[in-house]
Amino acid sequence: MGPVMPPSKKPEGTGISVSSQCYRSSTLSNPLQDDDDLDFPPPPVKIHKEKGGMEDEELTNLNWLHENKNLLKSFGDTVLRSVSPVQDIDDDTPPSPAQSDMPYDAKQNPNCKPPYSFSCLIFMAVEDSPTKRLPVKDIYNWILEHFPYFANAPTGWKNSVRHNLSLNKCFKKVDKDRSQSIGKGSLWCIDPEYRQNLIQALKKTPYHPYSHVFNTPPTSPQAYQSTSVPPLWPGSTFFKKNGALLQDPDIDAASAMMLLNSAHELQAGFSPGVIQNGARVLNRGIFPGVRPLPINPIGAMAASVRNGIANCRTRMESEPSCGSPLVSSDPKDDHNYSSAKSANKRSSSPSDSISSSADDHYEFAAKVCREGSDISFQSHESFSETEEEDKKQIKKELKEPLVESGYSSQHKKKQHLLKLRRIPSDALPLKKRRTEKPPESDDEEMKEAAGSLLHLAGIRSCLNNITNRTAKGQKEQKDKETTKN
């Protein structure tokens, strides 16, 4: 934009002076003249040549811009009107007399254009009707009746009215009743969300003779009673519905207020096991059904895992490696260290030590038959004094051939039971482990089981002898009969 020349100076060099027909009146103020210099469209001018020399060759000083502080206020109304939702869709409306100090009167000045926009005219027409809704032709008639200027005005104003009705958000179309006979077209009413905006726009005019429109009570449900309310805009916390001002949903408002009031409780009212950083924490007073999730500290969890791994290592070192799963030192790869604890609990109960299956009894009887004496059976079932003897004993059992195929599974069960009975003594020191002897109750139970098994074995041997004798007797009788024949 180049240097701006103040209005007090004349143009240089060309000798051309600009004089305006509209800006010579004494009623105009300096801000209007300043607006003419800010690249606004110039008024019609008359150009005539004068003889003049160059008065000043220096650049124009811009300090004169700070002298007038009301520069923006002079055209603030036009700027605000450009973003208002109630402005006219058609911008062909000339400046109205409302901008001057003279009041507007349609009866005294019938040829003067009214100071209202088309949206305000439509608003006044609809609000003046008893049903708060009008067709387009009735809006035309109301404007012509109250403002005689439009009787002789060009017909383009009707197009502006139709455009405002169809494109402006302040007006909406309503279905007509069957009882009404309005012909073609539809009824138009005021959108409740923008009614206050229309009222504010109408009150900006210095004089409007139809202020009684806003004081009359409405007679239909489409009318809206409250007028002394703050203007509505997108994002406001209030909205209108059937003439009443309502807040946003009560749940959101109540929860927000309670959260603000209980901020100190949220900071100090949690247990040390609740996650507070990086998580959304709720107050128990607001949400009684929601309970915080207790989280064990990381140090305690790591200590428990470390203890479990240490116990598994000691057990695996003290026990034979035959038939037992390998336990890794890494807790991620180890999935079996928890099974040893559960097996230990099962073996510690006396009922498990007393109860044994018939397969175990038969296996014990078979070992008695293989070894050939009761002493060997008892020495085999009793606990060894040292770990080396236990290892040798298990190796011997593995090398001995099994008579039947079912004995292999029973052999594994026996080894597992022996291993579980030995687990409680592993926690003791090595010297005590060597000197420790099995409890007397276990010895008595094993003796009783051995006696019952021997009794069963004797019964079986007796039955075998009887069957053999009967078979021999039958054979002898058959032989005698054959010899006689």
Curated annotation (Swiss-Prot):
Annotated segments matching region Disordered: 1-54, 85-108, 316-357, 401-449
Q: Which residues bind DNA?
A: 113-209
**Tissue-by-tissue expression:** At early cleavage stages, localized within the animal half of the embryo. At gastrulation, expression expands over the whole embryo excluding the future endodermal cells of the blastopore. During neurulation, expressed in the prospective eye field and in the neural crest cells. Strongly enriched in the eye vesicles at stage 26. From stage 29 onwards, expressed predominantly in the eye, the branchial arches and the vagal ganglion. At stage 38, expressed throughout the head with strongest expression in the head mesenchyme and the eye lens.
* Low complexity: compositionally biased ranges: 338-357
Keywords, A to Z, come to: Cell cycle, DNA-binding, Nucleus, Repressor, Transcription, Transcription regulation
- Spell out the Basic residues composition-biased ranges: 410-422
Q: Name one Pfam family in it.
A: Forkhead
**Per its UniProt entry, which superkingdom is the organism in?**
Eukaryota
Return one GO MF term: cis-regulatory region sequence-specific DNA binding
Keyword Acetylation included in the entry's annotation: no
Which GO CC terms are listed, alphabetically?
nucleus
Which segments show compositional bias classed as Polar residues? 16-30
State any GO BP term from the record: negative regulation of DNA-templated transcription
Main subcellular location: nucleus
List locations, semicolon-separated: Nucleus
The role this protein plays is:
Acts as a transcriptional repressor. May be involved in DNA damage-inducible cell cycle arrests (checkpoints).
Q: What is this protein's record name?
A: Forkhead box protein N3
